[in-house]
């Protein structure tokens, strides 16, 4: 090969090297979890990993998951989101409303996929369900009628119930306000009295159940990250205090809850890789519609 041709080849390789390097890089996905560890998020994280596997991804080879944990201290979401953005990651996954809001504050350019954010339009996470319009899209597991439907089913199963305690996470005010408004509107139609019961941290649960003992006829627990993580303890406390419990997750029925009504958590989290796969292949969050699971499952204690 002539010297001039060799120089051209070397120059061409040098120009192409950054593109080749980027092509060989493993995409990084940063996840903002609300719980404190992989063990606590085992079910949902497992669903995410299985979803990637089903799409042909192998963790560590052609996809890298970077998990961060807020340990139910939602102020940590801001720092965790900033840390992931600084790496940077290729996609952010935000679990719960506070995580989605923290991710939105952290970046306007990195694609964000939220899970379980309540009313993403009201929160101004997206412009619309069909066309989000920004760098954010995702899956909301909070159907508008879900809180009302839980009270309706609870009334059918426990017809003597008049006073219902509605647990709300005071550390998650956006969710709390929505749940209180929905439950009180539904209660009026069902001739129920709903009493909002604030829970700030998991450590409050024992005190809360001791306080409400014999003062209410049943307890309803909405979709919320902290309550999901504490679902077994909530069910056990309800059983110990002999209070009928309506909750969102079927696993709680096995340990003391009377009724569970809601969408499948594993199916919801299993859809997260679908969004990420689309984004990594060039789709924009602005054009990926928000999903709202339509199938809800009812489970009754035997």
Predicted feature descriptions by range:
Residues 1-302:
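Short hydrophobic alpha-helices and adjacent helix-cap/hinge residues
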